[in-house]
A protein has these predicted regions:
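Terminal catalytic/cofactor-binding subdomain
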Residues: 1-169, 177
Length: 181
């Protein structure tokens, strides 16, 4: 989940950049790992992507996860677009094409991140399977065209969708048809 920060201080040379980076460093005992795990939801009856609305849509999936986990909803223009763990130990968000993303808690070891991702997937399955939804953890959409890919109701994605075609030919595919793992 993006947590955008703006700093308009100009970089005036190599030392300014070095100092800026060094100011953000932490002692080794405070180093942490954070998982970003995206996956494509799809319907098992027809292998099509899952739209936002409807009784078996992304919104229903997020609402089910909210009830199960007790996490706080993230809203955009009244639409639930994610969940955040109340103490800041992780979040679930939506990417532009409905890619479901776990933004994990800051953890000490790769083994902890593995357990966190596995627990997330088990929780997700518990809500998704009754809806006829499964997930693909794969870098690119295997079969759905851009036109077949649903659009999530997140304000900034509308802005980005208008901008991307002006700066390249594959920006919309990157937004809607890719996942990170």
């Amino acid at each position: 989940m993006a947590r955008d920060i703006s700093d308009l201080t100009p970089i005036e040379g190599a030392q300014t950049l070095i100092d800026y980076i060094a100011a953000g460093s932490k002692p080794k005992e405070r180093w942490r790992l954070g998982t970003e795990h995206e996956k494509f939801p799809f319907y098992t009856d027809g292998n099509m992507p899952v739209p936002y609305d409807g009784p078996r849509g992304i919104k229903a999936l997020l609402e089910g996860m909210q009830m199960m986990l007790g996490w706080e909803p993230i809203l955009d223009a009244g639409n639930i677009i994610g969940l955040v763990e109340p103490t800041g130990a992780g979040a679930i968000s939506l990417e532009p094409g409905g890619q479901f993303e776990l933004s994990g808690a800051p953890l000490e070891t790769i083994h902890q991140t593995c357990r966190e991702a596995n627990a997330h997937l088990a929780q997700l399955r518990e809500i998704a399977e009754p809806l006829g939804i499964k997930f693909l953890g794969i870098g690119g959409s295997p079969k759905w065209t851009l036109a077949e890919t649903p659009r999530m109701p997140k304000t900034r994605y509308g802005i980005m969708s208008s901008y991307m075609p002006k700066v390249g030919t594959r920006g919309l595919d990157m937004m809607y048809r890719t996942c990170t793992i």
